[in-house]
Amino acid sequence: MAFQLTPLRVALVAGEPSGDLLGASLLGGLHARLPASSRYYGIGGPRMSAVEFDAHWPMEKLAVRGYVEALKHIPEILRIRGELKRQLLAEPPDAFVGIDAPDFNFGLEPALRGAGIPTIHFVCPSIWAWRGGRIKKIVKAVDHMLCLFPFEPELLEKAGVAATFVGHPLADEIPLEPDTHGARIALGLPGGGPVIAVLPGSRRSEIELIGPTFFDAMELMQQREPGVRFVVPAATPALRALLQPLVDAHPSLSVTLTEGRAQVAMTAADAILVKSGTVTLEAALLKKPMVISYKVPWLTGQIMRRQGYLPYVGLPNILAGRFVVPELLQHFATPDALADATLTQLRDDANRRALTDIFTDMHLALRQNTAQRAAEAVARVIDSRKPR
């Protein structure tokens, strides 16, 4: 390609942990594909920073969840976006890659695109799940979309947006057959009764909303299934400190609280109770029966209900096109209902076998060597803009 020996400058913006994972995967592919002296900079997290990325701002500045909750952070977020836009327009990069974070990136990308900077967006917003005019924003903002799921490019191309299916890096990372026994040994849980992993979220606000309900459900499950053991992974030391009082308030529970080992905890489990999010896809790739739940503040929930039109929110159900695992959301997420549904997932062997087949097919469809495919797509976009 024309730029084979020419150093490049690629700006990237990721706004939350899932975007940091995707960004790190993409950076790995770009380091292999583009000249060694190329520079990568913008907004990202620790995974991106670990692969030679210069984070001008930490992604935590953007990681705010919920419509109402974001209001108090809007001034700072707008200030950061304005400053980044000025920097990029003053010294245009060879390409800009917005990694998810559509509210932030779709407000930035049109100006960059208008200035002739190639704009690539990694992770198609859920245009297939939500009402409204997101597709119009995409048309204005994006030169090329990198899609995680195979049905997305066709939807985008109908609207005139170039798109490439690149798969999901988690499908490349996670083995087709999880080592449950090895994970239990790693967590100090080699013998004994069944194990349920409980994941109440990766943000303080999520844990504060649904954590007490999950722990009450765990209490009921232990009463109904004596010998059951629980493992609860905390994403950070701060979240572990937030979860510890819940553990202390339920002294009869057989629970292991871990830090930063969510995938190991899920691998060790026979069933999972999980707050909705990317982690549900991870649970599916690990071939685990699960119950998906969430609670958000009432007003946020009302807005989400009016905007959504798919009957499900969990990625395993969205990818399957039907309910393959139960979802208990908002006021339906009672301790009793969560306990019953999770124990059903634990005990139903026929359902476990069926889910293993469904999730294996899902895994194979998403295993596409994402880092290489995404990097090649970015390289093609850059090359298409270079003088011949």
UniProtKB/Swiss-Prot annotation:
Keywords: Glycosyltransferase, Lipid A biosynthesis, Lipid biosynthesis, Lipid metabolism, Transferase. InterPro entries: Glyco_trans_19. Its EC number is 2.4.1.182. GO terms for molecular function: lipid-A-disaccharide synthase activity; phospholipid binding. It comes from the Bacteria. It holds the Pfam family LpxB. GO terms for cellular component: membrane. It catalyses: a lipid X + a UDP-2-N,3-O-bis[(3R)-3-hydroxyacyl]-alpha-D-glucosamine = a lipid A disaccharide + UDP + H(+). Pathway: Bacterial outer membrane biogenesis; LPS lipid A biosynthesis. GO terms for biological process: lipid A biosynthetic process. Belongs to the LpxB family. Condensation of UDP-2,3-diacylglucosamine and 2,3-diacylglucosamine-1-phosphate to form lipid A disaccharide, a precursor of lipid A, a phosphorylated glycolipid that anchors the lipopolysaccharide to the outer membrane of the cell. HAMAP family: LpxB. NCBIfam families: lpxB (TIGR00215). This is Lipid-A-disaccharide synthase. It comes from Burkholderia pseudomallei (strain 1710b). The gene is lpxB.
